[in-house]
């Protein structure tokens, strides 16, 4: 089979879908992000890609914090829901039956049902 040459694009995949929690304890939000990964180990750096027109973009930009929650198979439907609807109009934690858990180093909540959560501070936009 001959090697194919394609134009530059977003062709790498599949990428892990994660549920990103943001906002405040009083007004928490969740968005599902597939564009995420590790940038560096020392110092530890990760990234997420969120379009500026998304509701969560403003929340993250304003607070400078978010929590990256690894999504188990049991939360597939919740992850799908959180990727399809805006948190500007509904509380996704309530709609999906998820539990906001207070952050340790950030003010935004994590998702208690997720097996691992990475509390993050924005260093570059």
How does the language model describe each region?
Residues 1-33, 37-125:
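Active-site-proximal mixed secondary-structure blocks
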């Amino acid at each position: 089979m001959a090697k194919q040459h394609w134009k530059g694009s977003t062709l790498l995949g599949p990428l892990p879908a994660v549920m990103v929690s943001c906002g405040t304890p009083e007004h928490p939000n969740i968005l599902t992000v597939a564009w995420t990964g590790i940038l560096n180990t020392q110092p530890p750096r990760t990234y997420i890609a969120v379009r500026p027109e998304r509701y969560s973009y403003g929340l993250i930009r304003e607070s400078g914090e978010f929590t990256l929650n690894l999504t188990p198979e049991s939360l597939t439907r919740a992850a799908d829901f959180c990727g399809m609807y805006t948190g500007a109009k509904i509380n996704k934690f309530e709609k999906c039956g998820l539990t906001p858990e207070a952050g340790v180093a950030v003010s935004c909540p994590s998702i208690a049902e997720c097996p691992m959560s990475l509390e993050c501070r924005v260093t570059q936009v």
